Curated annotation (Swiss-Prot):
The keyword Cytoplasm applies. It comes from Roseobacter denitrificans (strain ATCC 33942 / OCh 114) (Erythrobacter sp. (strain OCh 114)). One of its GO terms (cellular component) is cytosol. This is 4-hydroxy-tetrahydrodipicolinate synthase. Pyruvate binds at residues 44, 202. Gene3D superfamilies: Aldolase class I.
Length: 291
């Protein structure tokens, strides 16, 4: 159910407020362009700077707009287990297909703490849970052994892996089993991740190039890595440019260049520098997305 290219959706703003009309248009556009799923209110969706109510509204609107045509994986992570439970239960109540739960950031739990946290989330609802392991942001790295223990729980179904370590795919397959779903969380290494046994990517760049990334993921799933590599080469300058500064800022600027949404972000994030804008523009042209 959760395979292929799934954009980590941006949250559009206009004059400091949620721009829900643009959000709905983006959902339609992504489905039309071939995206295989939608992932609202993750890092790229600026979840840290949304209010609790805004977080819930975005999930609700994406679920309603998708209307069952593609799965919706709702961001539901927190370093407060009780808050994460509330988010998982809300995602289930409004009809999301799964919850994406980041490892608790800032308070640095042990591996035992990670097991307790994710077990509590597993037990609080009937919603499938995808672990989000991103040690560069959370400052805690879930080990393959810990992941293997959590994979024994029936509703812990997979991982979004943003470690950048392609050897992890094999290690996690060994500890979690071949049916445990592994999704890349890094656009620049997604091709190699799939070659190691991954089945898709929760992608930032897919916000601006959904058709190309859907085609790349489809080629990987069909075993046609040569075609997938040609698409990845076409997109690599854009991947790299988007992440020179925070990726959601880069991709919102790229989207604004294609009139998809405003580049507006919330503090403490700020607009791209002129130098980075020029590199994103060059990446868009290299990908054939802009003249």
């Amino acid at each position: 159910m959760f395979k292929g290219s799934m954009p980590a959706l941006v949250t559009p703003f206009r004059n400091g407020e949620l721009d829900l009309e643009t959000l709905k248009k983006l959902v339609e556009w992504h489905i039309g362009e071939g995206s295989n799923g939608l992932v609202p209110v993750g890092t790229t969706g600026e979840s840290p700077t949304l209010t609790h109510k805004e977080h819930e509204v975005v999930v609700e609107e994406v679920v309603k707009a998708a209307a069952g045509r593609v799965p919706v994986i709702a961001g539901a992570g927190s370093n407060n287990t009780l808050e994460a439970i509330r988010l998982v239960r809300h995602a289930e109540a409004v009809g999301a297909d799964a919850a994406l739960v980041v490892t608790p950031y800032y308070n640095k739990p042990t591996q035992s703490g990670l097991i307790a946290h994710f077990t509590a989330l597993h037990d609080c609802a009937d919603l499938p849970i995808i672990i989000y392991n991103i040690p560069g942001r959370s400052v805690v790295d879930m080990s393959p052994e810990t992941m293997g223990k959590l994979a024994e729980l029936p509703r812990i179904i997979g991982v979004k892996d943003a470690t950048g370590d392609l050897a992890r795919v094999c290690d996690q397959r060994s500890t979690c089993g071949p049916d445990f779903m592994q999704l890349s969380g890094e656009d620049a290494t997604a091709h190699g991740f799939n070659a190691q046994g991954g089945v898709g990517c929760i992608s930032v760049t897919a916000n601006v190039a959904p058709k190309l990334l859907s085609q790349m993921q489809a080629a990987c799933l069909a075993g046609d890595y040569a075609t997938a590599l040609s698409i990845q080469d076409r997109l690599m300058p854009l991947h790299k440019a988007i992440f020179i500064e925070p990726g959601l800022v880069g991709v919102k600027y790229a989207m604004s260049q294609l009139d998809l949404c405003s580049e507006e972000v919330r503090l403490p994030l700020t607009a791209l520098s002129d130098e980075t804008r020029a590199l994103v523009d060059a990446g868009l042209r290299h990908a054939g997305l802009m003249n």
